[in-house]
Structures are given as C-alpha cells and as structure tokens.
A protein has these predicted regions:
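Extracellular beta-helix/beta-solenoid repeat scaffolds
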Residues: 2-211, 227, 231-262, 320, ...
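Glycine-centered low-complexity coil/loop motifs and glycine-rich tracts
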Residues: 140, 144-149, 169-238, 250-322, ...
Length: 403
C-alpha cells in the first residue's frame, strides 16, 4: 500500500509542522531488534512481490545455506536480507547471531521539497539510511549514491532535468567499497660484513714473507618481505527505491546502477636489503727493516632481491536493488548493465637492494704499501609483481516493478 509523505514522516517521528515550513529533518532512530527493523523498512510491496524477492536472493546461492551449518557472513546476510525485504522466515540461530547488532541506530531524513545540483552522498558503511521526500528535483550535475549501506529511498515525485556530472553515468548508484590497499612488506636486512684478509707474514726474522690477504666479499642483502595482501571489498547492500507518484522533467528518466566492492591492491614488496660491506684487507707485516704490503679490501656484497608484491583482495558479490514506480512508468527507469567488482591487482615488487660498500685495504708493513680498496657490490633485482585476487564480485540484480 502506498503511503503519503506525511505518513512516512510521522512513522519516522519527524514534525509535520517543521517539514511544512521547509525544514529538512535528519534524525537517528534506535531500533531495538531485527523485527522492528523489518517493520521500519517495509516499502509497501505486496506479499507476492516480497516472496519473489526472497526466491531471487536464494536462487543465487547453491546449495541453499543451512542456518545450522552455514554461519558465514555472506550466508547470514543473505538469509537476513530475505527476511527483511522478502517474506522468508528467520531461523532462531540467525536471530542469535545478529542479536549483537541491536539496539541499532538508523539514520532517517525527510524533506518536503529537495533540489540538488551536485552529487548527493547518502553515506558509507552505515547501519541503515532511510530517505523520505515529497518532491525531489535533480538538476544538471546531480546524482545520488550510497556505499555499503542498506537504503530505503521513498519519494512521491521526481523531476529529473539535465545530465549527471561528468564521468558519471547514473542518477542513482548503490555501491560497495573498495578493499583497503595492503601495506608494504618490510625491507630485507643488510648483508653481513665480509671477513678480514689474513695478516702478512715474515718468512724469517728480518725477511719479508707474504702480503696481507684480500678481504672477503660482503654478504648478499636480505630479500625483502612479501607485501601484505589487499583487503576484500565491502559489498553493495540491499536498497528499495520507491516513486509513488511519477517521474517527470527533461529527460525525465532515472538511470540506476549498482556495483559491489572491488578488492584492494596488494601491498608493495619490501625493498631488498643493502649488500654487506666488503671485508678489510689483511695488514702487511713488518719484518725488521722491511715489510709486506697490505691486502686489498673485499668487494661489497650484492643488494638483496625485492620482496614479492602482496596478493590483491577479492571482489565481493553485491545485493539486490528493488525499484517500484507507478503504473505506466517502467520506461522511466533505465537499468545499467551489471558491473562486477574486480579482484584487486597484485602489489608492485619491492625495489632492489643497494650495492654493498667496498672494504678498505689493509695497512702496509714497514716501507711497504697499503692494500687498495675493494669494489662496490652489485645492486639487487626488482621483486616479482604480486598476483591478482582470486574472486570477482558479481553485481546484485536490479528489479523494477509497477506498484
């Protein structure tokens, strides 16, 4: 059964006098339990339509989730959605699982006449939002969207003039939220310093022997750690959009779309560690009036390999949208084709580790030369790119009916 603007406002506890005076009212309603929430979100759809909604929700789940054995977040949400927007019964176990959500605060908004000429953001990741309007005028440059929040949007008359903002192809969008990007992996550790060269020797008292030995090469820098995975997206949630009187204006149509939450990008791999410093050359020996040369320093160690980029997050499936318009106005609603939520791309590989510094030459013995410094190490290599997340989120359906 259709309700008037003022009847809906009264149910929300909004003052008729204030609304008649042109005041927009926004309030928070405390809902005590899930039955009260279902009652609050009744949109006037007849029993047969509500039954169709429940069947459509469950038709996407195979096998049908059993309340006793299937307690995943997705399964619970599906059964609760079928209860609130359809006529499916809710099992006692699901009631217990959702009990902690109550009492719940619901955002309610009423305005007798509202004109918008810019995007109207109804919120992100809130409990529930209810919008009650008499006449909504959407001028050029306007659009309406909500993210990861259940919505009940009821308006008597819509006047749609002009087009949405640039790069926006919808008038009303029910969206999810992209998962958070993974954080970068930790850098690899610095390679150890190379060992010192052997000391020079005297072959006999007063007679020089061997020069100092060369320092050994520094150790390779550590491999960077793998970037952290991107977060899974947050789903687009169920919405009812009801126009009780009609849609007019130029072009006088409403374009509706939905897309769930894409997976977040994987984190960048950690930078490879710096190569270790080359070991010092061994000192030359002093043998009476002569000595031996110091040994050359060791080469710096190679830089470490960058860490592999993190795995992208999963796109998550969206929930259904129910649009009701007056008889003869089905053509006033344009449904955009479903847009699936992509999986997040893998993170970039970590940068190469820096080349290790050269080791210093050993000092020379009496009247002998010190050893030369070693060479720098080579830089490491770039880490591998992370892999894309494993799941694409299927968009919810948009159902349009006369009522």
């Amino acid at each position: 059964m259709k309700s008037t603007f003022y009847e809906r406002a009264q149910a929300l506890g909004h003052s008729m006098e204030a609304l008649q005076a042109g005041t927009e009212i926004k309030s928070e309603i405390i809902v005590e339990d899930i039955d009260c929430l279902r009652k609050l979100l009744l949109d006037g759809a007849p029993p047969e339509a509500r039954q169709e909604r429940a069947e459509a929700i469950f038709s996407r789940l195979s096998p049908l989730p059993d309340p006793i054995n299937e307690g995943s977040e997705t399964a619970i949400l599906s059964r609760v959605t079928a209860f609130i927007y359809g006529d499916a019964p809710l099992d006692a176990m699901d009631r217990e699982r959702t009990k902690h959500l109550f009492p719940m605060s619901v955002t309610a908004f009423s305005a007798l006449n509202k004109t918008i000429s810019a995007p109207w953001d109804l919120g992100e990741s809130q409990n529930v939002v209810i919008v009650n309007l008499g006449t909504l005028t959407m001028e050029a440059g306007s659009s309406i969207f909500i993210k990861n929040t259940p919505l009940q949007f009821t308006v008597d008359s819509v006047i749609r003039n002009g087009a949405p903002p640039p790069n926006v192809n919808y008038d009303i969008a029910i969206l999810g939220v992209t998962g958070i990007a993974g954080t970068a992996g930790t850098a690899g550790g610095t390679g150890g310093v190379g060992g010192a060269g052997t000391n020079g020797t005297c072959s006999s008292p007063g007679i020089a022997g061997s020069a100092g030995g060369k320092g050994s090469t520094g150790a390779t820098g550590g491999t960077g750690y793998t970037g952290n995975p991107g977060g899974d997206g947050k789903p687009s949630l169920s919405a009812t959009i009801v126009v009780t009187t009609g849609i007019t204006g130029n072009p006088g149509v409403l374009t509706v779309m939905t897309q769930s939450g894409a997976g977040g990008t994987g984190g960048t791999g950690g930078t490879g560690g710096t190569g270790g410093q080359g070991g010092p050359g061994g000192p030359g020996a002093t043998c009476g009036c002569e000595g031996t040369n110091g040994g050359p320093g060791g080469n710096g160690g190679p830089g470490g390999v960058g860490g592999t980029g993190g795995t992208g997050g999963n796109g998550v499936p969206g929930n259904d949208i129910y649009v009701t318009v007056p008889p003869g106005q089905l053509s006033k609603i344009i449904k955009l084709p479903p847009v699936d939520a992509p999986a997040g791309v893998g993170g970039q590989g970590g940068g190469p580790g820096s080349k290790g510094p050269a080791g210093g030459g050993g000092g020379g013995g009496k009247h002998a030369n010190g050893g030369g410094g070693g060479g720098e190490g080579s830089p490491g290599t770039q880490g591998a790119h992370g892999v894309t997340g494993g799941s694409v989120g299927k968009a919810g359906n948009i159902y349009v009916k006369e009522g």
